[in-house]
């Protein structure tokens, strides 16, 4: 009888320990979330950043997911709320993030020429009679985003320098990204 009880107890012990030496398959892997602003087509942007995310994830030993926000502020709010761990953002968004979300800049990019600079562009149809910024007076304009330096702040300053009052001389709206 003792042998039978010992055998049953041994089987129960063995079966209760099965899987204890293995890592749990339900354990969640740590994921680092990278937020980016909508500077081009969202799917293309994620595809373009996939090699970077994979290389970074391999180096850190964790998965890196790329998140494209619907607006510039979306990345800042994501960092502030903790739903985004870090972001690749343009200069003005970085300044806003530092002020609004108590973040800090870890890396700062540099132009390929190595020289400081920034630019904004204004596009019109080829067959348009608009030849200068002053010709935009009375027109409808699409800016990128209120938090975009090149897509609103600098472009708006260029228009003001050309004698255009943004509130009186034009109608404008925000497209939501450089790709729109």
Stretches found by the model and what they are:
Residues 87-94:
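Ligand-binding clamshell of periplasmic/extracellular solute-binding protein-like
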Residues 16-19:
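C-terminal motif of bacterial Sec signal peptides marking the signal peptidase cleavage site
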Residues 73-87, 100-101, 134, 177-180:
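Short helices/loops that flank or line small-molecule/ion binding pockets
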């Amino acid at each position: 009888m003792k042998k039978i009880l010992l055998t049953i107890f041994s089987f129960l012990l063995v079966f209760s320990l099965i899987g204890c030496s293995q890592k749990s398959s339900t354990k969640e892997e740590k994921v680092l979330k990278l937020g980016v602003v909508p500077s081009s087509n969202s799917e293309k942007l994620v595809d373009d950043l996939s090699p970077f995310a994979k290389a970074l994830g391999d180096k850190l030993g964790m998965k890196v997911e790329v998140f494209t926000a619907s607006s510039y502020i979306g990345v800042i709010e994501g960092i502030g709320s903790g739903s985004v761990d870090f972001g690749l953002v343009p200069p003005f968004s970085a300044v806003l993030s530092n002020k609004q979300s108590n973040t800090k800049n870890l890396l700062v990019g540099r132009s390929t020429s190595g020289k400081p600079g920034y630019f904004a562009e204004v596009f019109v149809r080829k067959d348009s009679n608009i030849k200068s910024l002053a010709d935009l007076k009375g027109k409808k304009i699409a800016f990128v985003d209120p938090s975009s330096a090149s897509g609103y702040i600098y472009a708006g300053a260029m228009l003001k320098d050309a004698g255009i009052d943004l509130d009186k001389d034009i109608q404008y709206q925000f497209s939501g990204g450089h790709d729109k």
